[in-house]
């Protein structure tokens, strides 16, 4: 089996998503699954087998995260999906739409891991906007994204509920 993972974040950025991706990569490789990954380039990371890096620019106010170009992510994801059996999306940003588009174009099933309950902490990033309004918008976007998928993986019972 060949799986393509698509993410807006990966090492050297250390966070739960990067750690989860690496856990999937190790575990699935041990089971004989070929895993490909499309993720941002942060700087001068060495080339790594199975990892396609897309140019990324620092997020304003957050030097650890990267913004990836829409077209570059879509092109890299579509190319990497060739010969795959499944697309597994890891983040709900540009990678989500690139992974979904590549999967549909290649006729592949597409799943996502829903790592972050954005409706619970979006207020932290936009404190001047009403919390209830932000929560409803985040919930609506999450619902639309998840409903477009063939399956969703959640890392906890709280996320499932």
Question: Which stretches of residues belong to each language-model region?
Answer:
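N-terminal subdomain of nucleotide-sugar transferases
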Residues: 1-55, 82
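Active-site proximal beta-strand in glycosyltransferases
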Residues: 3, 86, 103-123, 135, ...
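Hydrophobic/aromatic ligand-binding patch that stacks against planar heteroaromatic rings
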Residues: 27, 98, 102, 145
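Alpha-helix capping/helix-boundary segments
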Residues: 43, 94-95, 158-160
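Short, hinge-like loop/turn segments at secondary-structure boundaries
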Residues: 51-56, 105-107, 128-132
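An amphipathic, basic-hydrophobic alpha-helix
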Residues: 59-101, 105, 140
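Membrane-proximal helix-turn-helix segments that form the acceptor-binding/catalytic region
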Residues: 105, 133-151
């Amino acid at each position: 089996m060949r799986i393509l993972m698509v993410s807006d974040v990966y090492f050297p950025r250390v966070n739960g998503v990067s750690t989860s991706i690496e856990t999937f990569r190790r575990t699935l490789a041990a089971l004989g699954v070929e895993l490909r990954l499309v993720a941002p380039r942060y700087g001068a990371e060495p080339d790594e087998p199975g990892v396609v890096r897309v140019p990324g620019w620092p997020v304003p106010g957050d030097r650890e995260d990267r913004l990836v170009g829409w077209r570059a992510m879509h092109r890299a994801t579509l190319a990497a999906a060739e010969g795959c059996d499944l697309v597994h999306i890891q983040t709900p940003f540009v990678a989500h739409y690139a992974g979904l588009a590549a999967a549909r174009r290649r006729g592949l099933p597409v799943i996502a891991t829903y790592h972050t309950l954005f409706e619970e902490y979006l207020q932290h990033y936009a404190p001047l906007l009403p919390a209830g309004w932000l929560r409803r918008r985040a919930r609506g976007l999450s619902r639309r994204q998840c409903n477009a998928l063939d399956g969703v993986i959640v890392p906890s019972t709280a996320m499932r509920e």
